[in-house]
UniProtKB/Swiss-Prot annotation:
Location within or outside the cell: Mitochondrion inner membrane
Membrane-topology annotation of the record: Multi-pass membrane protein
Residues annotated as transmembrane: 33-53, 77-98, 113-133, 178-198, 226-246, 288-308, 320-340, 347-367
Note, other: Heme 1 (or BL or b562) is low-potential and absorbs at about 562 nm, and heme 2 (or BH or b566) is high-potential and absorbs at about 566 nm.
Protein name, UniProt field: Cytochrome b
Keyword hit for ATP-binding: no
GO CC annotation terms, alphabetical: mitochondrial inner membrane; respiratory chain complex III
């Protein structure tokens, strides 16, 4: 009798993806973040589902319904904070996952990389709409400022913004549709994740050396299932520590004030995971230019495979490229810091220099340094 694991139409798909999958024998903990993102998505969908059972998407009651969840619903407070801080964990894992792909040259798997960029955009859109739902001051003004950026699009901009708002300002219609999309998008993301994995399993995983490892593959289970389980444990412990000891650490105090269209907060800023892009947006003193820079700051990832000039895939044996990579990381941290600061001297010029350097490293310096390294290695 054949093993049901290998013969059942449905189970054999799971088997070929999670059990008998041939995996490189040398992938490090940097390859754990894919599965951690899967856990984050599951946590977000589950906590979000239970929150949606008690939340009301109406401008008059949204803020109070979130307060009601925290005060009156059994374990509502932990659901709310798991969901809010789970989003932060999601983005930490996302950025580390993308950084790993950049460092080890995983972007050469172009289909997987491109669907990954679409996933990044989808997660960012979901997080933005989720931030609007509690209907605090930063929710309202964040929604107003970010949606208003679309008015910079020539000719159709104003009509587009009013169409998204469902009126002439951010109001009840906006909140209702944001809730609808915020509920729907994670399931679309889950479907896109399946496609992401489908493309990945067509080619197999990359590894730290960047050299094909087909001749030295090991089964995913038990080796990487146990390794992933350790990752889950560490991440869930970190998330629970954040939720139980300092749940508001990454939030904005302004969001504990109900939304008031007549009172603008002194500093409108998004959640910490968007600050680097927000800093790039603000660094250009022109609305359309800023919006283009904002979109390009993420979209630039799509042309990285075309800019790969090195004869080696990974940066493991390329020390000069490594220096540039870590300069890019430091630059992104600088942009994140600048995004949270007021628009005044010296933050303006620091933000502008960091924004220029961000695009310079990716578009000019990395390809040039790769060519130089080829020359130094006589390739």
């Amino acid at each position: 009798m054949t093993n049901i694991r290998k013969s059942h139409p449905l189970i054999k798909i799971i088997n070929s993806s999670l059990v008998d999958l041939p995996a490189p024998s040398n992938i490090s903990s940097w390859w754990n973040f894919g599965s951690l993102l899967g856990v984050c998505l599951a946590i977000q969908i589950l906590t979000g589902l239970f929150l949606a059972m008690h939340y009301t998407a109406d401008t008059a009651t949204a803020f109070n319904s979130v307060t009601h969840i925290c005060r009156d619903v059994n374990y509502g407070w932990i659901l709310r904070y798991l969901h809010a801080n789970g989003a932060s964990m999601f983005f930490i894992c996302l950025y580390l996952h993308v950084g790993r792909g950049l460092y080890y040259g995983s972007y050469t798997l172009t289909e997987t990389w491109n669907i990954g960029i679409l996933l990044l955009f989808a997660v960012m859109a979901t997080a933005f709409m989720g931030y609007v739902l509690p209907w605090g001051q930063m929710s309202f003004w964040g929604a107003t400022v970010i949606t208003n950026l679309l008015s910079a699009i020539p000719y159709i901009g104003t009509d587009l913004v009013e169409w998204i708002w469902g009126g002439f300002s951010v109001d009840k219609a906006t909140l209702t549709r944001f809730f609808a999309f915020h509920f729907l998008l994670p399931f679309i993301i889950a479907a896109m994740v399946m496609v992401h994995l489908l493309f990945l399993h067509e080619t197999g995983s990359n590894n730290p050396t960047g050299i094909p490892s087909d001749m030295d593959a090991i089964p995913f289970h038990p080796y990487y299932t146990i390794k992933d389980a350790l990752g889950f444990l560490i991440m869930i412990m970190a998330l629970l520590t954040l939720v139980l000891f300092s749940p508001d650490l990454l939030g904005d105090p302004d969001n504990y004030t109900p939304a008031n269209p007549l009172n603008t907060p002194p500093h409108i800023k998004p959640e910490w995971y968007f600050l680097f892009a927000y800093a790039i947006l603000r660094s250009i003193p022109n609305k359309l230019g800023g919006v283009l820079a904002l979109v390009l700051s993420i979209l630039v990832l799509a042309i990285i495979p075309l800019l790969h000039t090195s004869k080696q895939r990974s940066m493991t044996f390329r020390p000069i490229s490594q220096c540039l990579f870590w300069l890019l990381v430091a630059n992104l941290l600088t942009l994140t810091w600048i995004g949270g600061q007021p628009v005044e001297h010296p933050y303006i010029i620091i933000g502008q220099l960091a924004s220029i350097l961000y695009f310079m490293i990716i578009l000019i310096l990395m390809p040039l340094v790769s060519i130089m390294e080829n020359y130094l290695l006589k390739w």
